[in-house]
Every structure is written in structure tokens, then in C-alpha cells.
Amino acid sequence: MRVTSLHPLFGVEISGVAAENLSEPALATEIRHTAHEHGFVLLRGIRLTADRAMTLARLLGNPEIGYRPEFTHNQYPELVLLGNMGEVDGGMAYLNTQGVEWHTDATGKGLAPGVTMLYCLKTPMEAGDTLFASTDAAYAALDDDRLSAYRDLKVVHSFNVHNDKVASFGGTNVSVQQEALRNRYPDTTDPVVTIHPFTRRPCFFISHQLVKEVVGYSQKHGNDLVMNLVRYITKKRFVFRHRWKEEDLIIFDNIACLHSATEYDYEGQDRLFYQIIISGQNKAQHGTRD
């Protein structure tokens, strides 16, 4: 296994690994540790079936049931279908037309933050990129005066608030969830600054689209604090833009990274991904359920 840097601050490419080797527990553990340490890892030319993807996901941690069941694989409720190809593998591919929207896959669901697998089956020629931002590098670079506004800040993340917004966008195939699914993910109160359980480095932990409330602040003041922080974390120097190729696999850490889609400007071109969100192996609660 060879590791090559992709960005001065975070992100590495792993080479010398074949798809069939990803079922080896020791290798999966090494890949997970590398993702924790560097924020994300990229493996290219990895031919994954749904079966192989799930085998790897189970070695990386605890794969979570897809939070929108209609967009999951017919054999694996943990395997989410992303893209614009309609019905695939017995499920419907989830199409988010929102564009740039920074988040982490751990907020708003009460999960112990772990990693997410994104695997590219089909991608447009010159669109459909994914952005990653380093939350620990951003923390390390911020001066103490500005940090003081965030060290003790807490926010209420709500997956339902986020899903309602996504359902309102034109062209999406996402619907407002009914009561049983809404109750599945109670709001969580999370510290904006957290210590990564593996690296022990402080990181920012925030998903602005999911923020329902900033504890102790008016809506306007709280929103200003959150958006100023997100604009800082996502400055160009902290961001890596990935241009996908088919058979690319990225595994990213949901504390050390924020990520975002880019504009939906590839109508007429196919895009299809597997996504598996994997909660941390330490089930200790990161935030608190309300």
C-alpha cells in the first residue's frame, strides 16, 4: 500500500491495493486509520460490486440504514444510490439539485461520527465534482480571538429541517418525510468544536444546512456565527476539489472533513454513486439527543 498526498493540508491517494484485497480486515483497518489521520483517502481503479462494497463497509465500522429508504439498494438498505439515473438496483437514485452545500454525514442523526464511502459507477465528463474541506486544518489556522467565539458554542442539528429544504428545491426527487421517519432522527445538540477521537486534534463540527438553532443566540446572530465559520472553513486553502473517474472510491472522515456537491449542470449525462455512511466503532454519543 502506497500513500501519496493530494493536498498540502489533507487528503491522500492509496495505490497498490486491489478490490479483492479490501475484504482483508487488517487492510480495511489500515485504510480507516489513514482516513482518520488525513481526512480522506482516494483509491482509483477499484471495481466494486454492491456485495464487495458492503463487505468493506462492515470492516470499517457500523453501516447505517439509509435515511431515505426509497433511495437504497434492494438487497442492502445501508447502500444509498446517488445520481440522476432513476431506478437502479431496485431503488431510485437520489438526486439533490441544491449544488454547493457544506455538511458532514454525522450531524443530525445521533450517530457516533465515523466515515463515509463514496464509490463512482458513472460520472459526467466535466461536471459532478465533490468538494472536501479540512476542519482540523481550519481550526489550527484560526487565531485565538476568533476561536473564542466558537470554543463553547453549541448548535442544534436537525436532519428533518435539512430534508424539508432539499424537498423544496426544483427538479429534486426528494419528498418530505412522514412521521415515522421524522421520528427516527431526533434533533441533536452538538459542540461546534470537538476533539477527534483518533487523532486527538481539535476540529470544527458543523453542517449549516442542518442547523435549527444556535444555543443561547437569536436566530439572526446565531446564523451569522455559523455562516461566518463555514465561509472560513471552506476558504480555498482548506479545500480539495475531486474530479471523479469511474471506479474511484473515496472514504472520508466525518469529523475531520466537510464535503459538498457542486452545481447540478450535467443533465443528459449519467451520474451514479454508491454511498454508505458508517458510524464510528466507539458508540459513545458525540452530542446529546433532545
PLM regions and their residue ranges:
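Non-heme Fe(II) oxygenase catalytic core, chiefly the N-lobe of the double-stranded beta-helix
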Residues: 1-249, 255-290
